Amino acid sequence: TLCELMRQLVGHGNYASISLADFGKDFMLEPLIHAQAVITDENDVGTYVDKAANLKAVVTGDAININRKFKVPLTYCFHGLVVQCLNEMPRIRDKSDSFYRRQLFIAFTKCFTGVERKYIKQDYLHRQEVLEYVLYKVLNMNYYSFDVPGACENVLEEYKEFNDLVRQFAEEIFPV
């Protein structure tokens, strides 16, 4: 539902859906050229991302090379928002602080199984007045950057341990 709201705000044709795994594959980044945001509802469970350099560069607006089928590759800087929805934490080969500092994990702990109200996603999020209200609130907030809540910092620490077997071992043997 959150991704649908974001897509409606950005507008059709102004977003791309590129999974975490696809950021490391040839020919999968061309949609970035026309996108203002990457909004991905689903990533495969159990995904292992071997190559994270493009993901890191896209998140921070650095230059990347985009290989295009039967066309000349081009260098491109993406200056949009990247949102990836996950059902479980992915394993990433890159365990550096430069990767971790680019991530903001937000845990959605509420479960709506059996009480899903599809009309919210299918009706409300497409209403002009709802979109105008949300956009007004976003544009009229006093902020320069995102604050990182303690809950998000905790999830990041959990993720660092989950993603790094050496760190897991150290936490078990040498608890703080």
Question: Language-model segments: which ranges?
Answer:
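Feature primarily recognizes SF3-like P-loop helicase cores of small DNA viruses
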Residues: 1-176
